[in-house]
Every structure is written in C-alpha cells, then in structure tokens.
Amino acid sequence: MGSVRVAIVGVGNCAASLVQGVEFYKDADPESRVPGLMHVQFGEYHVRDIEFVAAFDVDAKKVGLDLSEAIGASENNTIKICDVPDAGVTVQRGHTLDGLGKYYRMTIEESEQAPVDIVQVLKDKQVDVLVCYLPVGSEEAAKYYAQCAIDAKVAFVNALPVFIAGTKEWADKFTEAGVPIVGDDIKSQVGATITHRVMAKLFEDRGVVLDRTMQLNVGGNMDFKNMLERERLESKKISKTQAVTSQIRDRDLGEDNVHIGPSDFVAWLDDRKWAYVRLEGRAFGDVPLNLEYKLEVWDSPNSAGVIIDALRAAKIAKDRGIGGPVLSASSYFMKSPPVQYFDDEARDNVEKFIKGEAER
C-alpha cells in the first residue's frame, strides 16, 4: 500500500490541526468507530498513510522551521491535541501575491527570503496532493497555486472560498491536464454551514416554509482578523450563502431574507468560533415557527476532520487517472462544489466513489 504525499500551502491553524491529526490517529483501528473521523480507512488509504513532504508560507516566523515547529509558531492559536515529532520538512518561502491582507500585514512580518520554485519543489518531492490553506480573499494567490498543481501534475484540494473547481474555466483546465481537484471552500465536520443546511432542509422536508434566515459568526483566529477587511469577503459570503440556499430547490428566498457571513473578531476566543443561527418559517395554518441556536467549535480541528478525507479522495482520483473536479468528494466536503447535492445524497456518492462504483 502506498502513501499520500502531501504539500501544504499556508501553515496556519488548519494545517496545525491536520498535521497533529495524522499523528493522533496513526494507530486508529480501521474496524472501529473512532471519534472525529468519518473514515479511518478511506479506500486503500489509512490516516497514517498521509505523509507531509513539503510546506510553504510567507510568515518570517514560520519560513525555515521544521513543519512540526511551524504549526505552533507566530499567530497560530488552535488547541493542541498531541505532540508531533520532527517532520523532516522545512517550511519554504511561498509566493505572496494577494495572500496578505491589511490585517495580516499589521500582525505578521513577511519573510525576506526569495520565493522558491513551487512547481519544481512539487516535482522534486513527488507530491501527490497540494492542499491550499491560504487566507480568505487570496484570489490571485490561490489560482497561482492551482496552476502550479496543474503544471506539476499534482492533485489539488482547495480549502478556501476562491472559486476554482466550481468554474468552467478552471474545471476544464484540470480536466484537460488530467489532474484531479476537490473544491471549493472546506465544509467543516459539524460547523455552521452543515448544521444550517440540515436545518433549512428539515424545515422544507417537514412542510415548514422557510421565509428568512441568518448566520452570524465570531472567532479569535487570524482567519477572523483577516476577514475584518470586508473587501476580501465577497467570495466567502457567496460561498457560505449558496451552501445553505442550495437546499431550497423550488424558490429564491431573496437577498434581503438571507444574511450569512463572518461578523467580528474576538481575540480571546482564540481558534474557537461561535455561530449564531436563526431560521424563521411558517408552519401549519401559516403559524410562525422559529428556530435559533448557537454552535461553539474549535474551528481548525473541525476543518481537519474533513480535509483528512478530501486528501485521500484526491489521491484515489489521481491513482485512477481522473482529471477535473471530483464531484462526489467536492459536494460532500466543500461549501461551493461544481454541483450541489443534498448531504445524504452526497455522502452516498462518496461511498460509491471509494468503492469504484462512481467514476468521480
């Protein structure tokens, strides 16, 4: 059985949780129900088969460090779940482009080292999958790394809300190159998006007409600080909104009746996120029915529990010679896939893909 050789772009909290998670679950029993994992064994790949072989960042406090040290450096503030041994992987200087917004530049020091040749590193390290963890709003940078993946013939997992897999232009590029992509915008295990989607669909399935809804999110990590720069938020708001409204198939709720997005930065929350969600509808006899809930999560482990499957799905697609969007994995693991399915249907499609019963 082979390994899944992974390169990381952006060694922030999400990368920290992913790297720790692979170590934490390395001895998990494939036959057991393990808290925190949807699949201990994903096809032929166990969690321990994920191997980190390259990492890129632009933060002066991370570039040059071993990956095991960089995940705890600079502004990273997620919860520690285990110790990580020396990885033997030095974080290299990536390309900044539009990856650093105003608040990042106010907070971190950009590395003065020269950027490395990303494509050459991907080839030299024989990378299978490149996972993109760049900050929200990194449109140019995300597309740059997507092109690097294509040029190096490396599968691409797009964890941020820049529309790549979901656009015809980029989907065609990946398809023509024979390179798989899983995207766009990671949907956490049990986060605001997945719970909001489920509740919206529950209203509809039970005969309650959803009239309006909102989702407000606050957090204390660099992701939330970066999103104080509202100019970088357009794709994020679109991604989170369409993830929920896609569950209402027979009508448009109207722009004024849906408000979904990040709201504020609260430093003392660290990597925790608090989501406040409200749904208002009409039930039997046109009587009002309202649901309001609060979700508290550690944001980055919540993401890692899904990325850990997305990486293996991308590797399986690469093994099978599939190019372009992996629709099953994208629809279940991402907020803005090329095709939106109901979550139970998307999950079934993933299981079929693992078994080889569905091409993509």
Q: Predicted regions span which residues?
A:
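NAD(P)-dependent Rossmann-like dehydrogenase/reductase catalytic/cofactor-binding core
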Residues: 302-360
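Active-site-lining helix/loop region of Rossmann-like oxidoreductase modules
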Residues: 9, 48-51, 62, 69-76, ...
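Rossmann-fold NAD(P)-binding glycine/threonine-rich loop
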Residues: 136-151, 159-180
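Gly/Ser/Thr-rich loops at beta-strand to alpha-helix junctions
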Residues: 10-16, 134-140, 160-166, 187-193, ...
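Short catalytic-loop micro-motif centered on adjacent basic/acidic residues
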Residues: 130-132, 156-159, 182-185, 212-213
